[in-house]
Regions:
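Glycine-rich flexible loops
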Residues: 1-205
Length: 205
């Protein structure tokens, strides 16, 4: 089987995301890049994740062209591959419709971190709604991530992460509940920088 390693990585990641409650049914999509081959493995469209096999995972070029696999890729290769083209450092992309990210994407223009582990993802910007799978959505996501961003929220849609998606959903959940209680206190800029430095040095926060 061609591209077996990245296909298996995608399958493992999508099952973990499903177990964490970040993905339901066949919603959401995950991709992993093969830098040497210049392709990415991405979840296929409409296939149940619990019965999926590595060979079911679609392969696309970094321009989004489907080149291998028995099932068509998710509708979102333009968004995934736009991130890969803009960010050579990114090796995997997770897009989901997790509840709290989706809710907060409709309520705020930026989601600030409120705990040390969330600092790694700051700032988490919110991009305007665009039709899923469109070039407009792909372009706005790549622009919002910039040169070092790790996550964005998609208004009326969900989120996209280049890292541990569970922390982004946690950030949205904490912000939602704290706001509901009447006082949401995010980390300050100096604290965010300090936490990022600790994380970059491999120190747990």
């Amino acid at each position: 089987m061609k591209y077996e390693d990245i296909r298996r990585q995608v399958l493992t990641a999508i099952r973990q995301a499903s177990a964490q409650g970040l993905i339901h049914g066949t919603s959401g999509n995950i991709s992993v890049r093969d830098r040497e081959a210049g392709v990415a493995a991405i979840t296929p469209s409409g296939r149940p994740y619990d019965t999926m096999e590595p060979g079911d995972i679609a392969i696309v070029t970094l321009e989004g062209e489907w080149v291998d696999g028995p099932y068509a890729p998710s509708s979102e290769p333009p968004m995934h591959t736009a991130v890969y083209r803009a960010r050579p450092d990114v090796g995997a992309v997770v897009h989901n419709h997790a509840l709290f990210c989706t809710v907060m994407a409709m309520a705020v223009d930026e989601l600030p971190p409120s705990t040390p582990p969330q600092a790694e993802f700051a700032p988490i910007r919110v991009v305007p709604f665009a039709v899923p799978g469109s070039r407009a959505l792909a372009a706005s996501v790549a622009a919002a991530l910039g040169t070092d961003g790790l996550a964005v929220l998609l208004r009326n849609h969900g989120s996209l992460c280049c890292g541990a998606a569970a922390y982004v959903e946690e950030a949205a959940q904490v912000a939602y509940y704290a706001s509901a209680l009447g006082r949401f206190t995010p980390l300050g800029e100096a604290d965010i920088r300090a936490c990022k430095e600790m994380l970059a040095a491999g120190r747990a926060v």
